[in-house]
């Protein structure tokens, strides 16, 4: 996420503000906030408050090419699920993974979408490390992203999930 406009667009999609063409409203009641934004906040206000807490930004500006946020989509697919699969258990494992990898304080929100073709979680992270924005501290290279996939599998294998399309990049429509 490289702009405040992108934060706004993510917020509108994740919290179902306005028309969402690929969402089925009949299932929207099943969506759930796993990690909640503070009451009355948006991704923009959450980001601004986080930066105001950092002494570094009292004397420094945000770089023009800075990554302001990261968004991850965590999914369990729809085929080949174990008979005893529990969405609640998967959500808890996913939440723990996010908190362990990025720190609870850096997570703006995690929202479960059950109203699209494949159930998934959108997690928005403000990548703060050592008192300043640093996406590179969390994802220095492609291998780090691959390692993240492997770590996520370690968390979710207990609920019976196996990775399907390992390292596949999916463009969200």
Model-derived features: positions:
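N-terminal nicking endonuclease/strand-transfer module with a His-rich metal-binding environment
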Residues: 1-173
């Amino acid at each position: 996420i490289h702009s405040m406009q992108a934060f706004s667009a993510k917020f509108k999609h994740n919290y179902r503000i306005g028309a969402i063409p690929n969402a089925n409203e009949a299932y929207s009641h099943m969506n759930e906030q796993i990690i909640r934004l503070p009451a009355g906040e948006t991704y923009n206000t959450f980001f601004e408050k986080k930066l105001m807490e950092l002494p570094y930004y009292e004397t420094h500006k945000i770089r023009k090419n800075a990554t302001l946020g990261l968004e991850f989509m965590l999914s369990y697919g729809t085929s080949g699920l174990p008979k005893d699969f529990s969405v609640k258990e998967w959500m808890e494992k996913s939440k723990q993974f996010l908190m362990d990898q990025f720190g609870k304080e850096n997570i703006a929100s995690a929202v479960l979408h059950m109203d699209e073709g494949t159930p998934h979680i959108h997690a928005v992270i403000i990548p703060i490390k050592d008192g300043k924005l640093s996406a590179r501290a969390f994802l220095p290279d492609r291998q780090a992203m691959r390692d993240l996939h492997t770590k996520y599998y370690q968390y979710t294998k207990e609920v019976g999930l196996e990775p399907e399309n390992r390292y596949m990049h999916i463009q969200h429509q």
